[in-house]
Amino acid sequence: MSEENVVYIGNKPVMNYVLAVVTQMNGGTSEVILKARGIAISRAVDVAEIVRNRFIPDIQIENIDICTEEIIGNEGTATNVSAIEIQLRKD
């Protein structure tokens, strides 16, 4: 999976990420991965569900990976942050 098929979910409105996924799918890509960490995880789930239910009904959720990443802060302290990857595939 190339890096251009990955949509990183952050603090922007949900519809911005939905548009990014729909644009990639309409451009000929058959697979897109949504990646999010921390509080953006719920936004990533929202993006996947909006794309699946409203825009591209024949899209499938191929795989969901969850993990915990260790982030090193400015003071050198380690913080655990939850992360998710949602793999979407269009047949």
UniProtKB/Swiss-Prot annotation:
Span-the-membrane segments of this chain are none
- In the record, what terms sit under GO molecular function? double-stranded DNA binding; RNA binding
A Pfam family: Alba
Instruction: Indicate where this protein resides in the cell.
Output: Cytoplasm; Chromosome
> Which segments does the entry list as coiled coil?
none
An example GO biological process term is: chromosome condensation
- GO cellular component entries: chromosome; cytoplasm
Q: Which UniProt keywords apply?
A: Chromosome, Cytoplasm, DNA condensation, DNA-binding
Q: Which domain of life is it from?
A: Archaea
Keyword ATP-binding assigned to the entry: answer is no
InterPro entries membership: Alba-like_dom_sf, DNA/RNA-bd_Alba, DNA/RNA-bd_Alba-like
Function text:
Binds double-stranded DNA tightly but without sequence specificity. Involved in DNA compaction.
Family to which this protein belongs? Belongs to the histone-like Alba family.
**Name of the protein this chain belongs to:** DNA/RNA-binding protein Alba
Native species of this protein? Methanothermobacter thermautotrophicus (strain ATCC 29096 / DSM 1053 / JCM 10044 / NBRC 100330 / Delta H) (Methanobacterium thermoautotrophicum)
The gene behind this protein is: albA
